[in-house]
Amino acid sequence: MNESPDPTDLAGVIIELGPNDSPQTSEFKGATEEAPAKESPHTSEFKGAARVSPISESVLARLSKFEVEDAENVASYDSKIKKIVHSIVSSFAFGLFGVFLVLLDVTLILADLIFTDSKLYIPLEYRSISLAIALFFLMDVLLRVFVERRQQYFSDLFNILDTAIIVILLLVDVVYIFFDIKLLRNIPRWTHLLRLLRLIILLRIFHLFHQKRQLEKLIRRRVSENKRRYTRDGFDLDLTYVTERIIAMSFPSSGRQSFYRNPIKEVVRFLDKKHRNHYRVYNLCSERAYDPKHFHNRVVRIMIDDHNVPTLHQMVVFTKEVNEWMAQDLENIVAIHCKGGTDRTGTMVCAFLIASEICSTAKESLYYFGERRTDKTHSEKFQGVKTPSQKRYVAYFAQVKHLYNWNLPPRRILFIKHFIIYSIPRYVRDLKIQIEMEKKVVFSTISLGKCSVLDNITTDKILIDVFDGLPLYDDVKVQFFYSNLPTYYDNCSFYFWLHTSFIENNRLYLPKNELDNLHKQKARRIYPSDFAVEILFGEKMTSSDVVAGSD
């Protein structure tokens, strides 16, 4: 079994906690590696706390089972020659060239019809070009049959029709080249045949439509990169069976977006054919939707912003709801999607893998999802959960399942006393921090009188004292803005999510690779390797503040 393509992405969640361990310990693994001791005085408390556990045999066995099935699906590419041919016929350039040839062929035929009516004839060279184009597409069909196998290729009705049209048009071109059409027109019984030939020529328009369809498939494959696709039984969808009953896929689209994403009609056809009356679709996008009637009103929408996390409450409700749906019938399945079908989808799928005890730890679930979603036959690029906060929330949910019996933890109300930013670049100016809770901005450093900033030049460290004892609880988002640094997702320099119930010792330390946006390759050149953010909290201890977690 190959390792996950991007193991560093799992750094924040590979700690397996025992019943007596703190649920927050996993968040500090990176601190022991990244932060200098003199800059993070509490780091030493967490050294040695991390215990890396191997992936369980049951998870590896489940992955191996899927690998055998996937190997059967790609058995047609088992030789070097077939791999080379497949890479050629499935390339974007090859598909674009095919569309160009069809347009050229249609142009020649229209010219032929116009000049024929004028008692003139297209030169033999032009007709030879048309014949060469027909031979090219015949070769294209033969190569695709060679790669995909005859039974699979001709399981698609459009492929059957296109092949028939190519053969007919090839015969028409042969007739035009090797017979004297002018002589045949003087024979009355051939008149109707010639008219029929002209009509058959117009079938090239259908061939153009089919080539456009092939080009759309190539564009969708390019957009989905090396995400594992479903390419059986005439389907070609950005869709992966994570387990036999859990499907992860990209957004079912219509209109122009269906040109490069899963067409919603094809997704409906797939689910109705494979799991009729036994599927439920979960749309995790807050930014886009579709008419649930497409899926017979079996759609549940969970509002999660792109590149952000679900609330812990949403994760608990989702996993319990899916578990109940699965228990109703052994044939019931769920199809889960966001926009691309990796980060938000992966976060929720990983939560259910833990809830259903397919995986026992956050590390296992993240590894498992990444292995299933990534098609390594095309590229080693990791297609699992990559955003640090999303991985952090999978780790939170693992504690919810194991330490809190699948219920929300008791609510902790905290307030921020200090922000400490380590190894800040010297050219950085105009720092702004913004805190959101329950979709509302509850704090901003731009407000006068709420904080003071101390810039320590000798240690490249910024200390921000917060005067406003604003109570924070449950899911909290912290954003950082620099006026002279690039902005990425969420229109900020970087950000992260935390849940107050999992903060230990009133301290949270996050190195660069656990800050959202800064985990991206393009941000690594700007921020030093030991860049980090630390937050020191105080706690509200009054009886009115200590309340149970929301349900």
Curated annotation (Swiss-Prot):
The active site is at 338. GO terms for cellular component: cytosol; membrane. Residues 1-47 are annotated as: Disordered. GO terms for biological process: protein dephosphorylation; signal transduction. It is a multi-pass membrane protein. SUPFAM superfamilies: (Phosphotyrosine protein) phosphatases II, C2 domain (Calcium/lipid-binding domain, CaLB), Voltage-gated potassium channels. It catalyses: O-phospho-L-tyrosyl-[protein] + H2O = L-tyrosyl-[protein] + phosphate. Pfam families: Ion_trans, PTEN_C2, Tc-R-P. Keywords: Hydrolase, Membrane, Protein phosphatase, Transmembrane, Transmembrane helix. The keyword Hydrolase applies. The keyword Transmembrane applies. Residues 30-45 have a biased composition (Basic and acidic residues). Residues 228-404 form the Phosphatase tensin-type domain. Gene3D superfamilies: 2.60.40.1110, Protein tyrosine phosphatase superfamily (3.90.190.10), Voltage-gated potassium channels. Chain C (1.20.120.350). GO terms for molecular function: monoatomic ion channel activity; phosphatidylinositol-3,4,5-trisphosphate 3-phosphatase activity; protein tyrosine phosphatase activity. Its EC number is 3.1.3.48. This is Putative tyrosine-protein phosphatase TPTE. The lineage of its organism: Eukaryota, Metazoa, Chordata, Craniata, Vertebrata. The gene is TPTE.
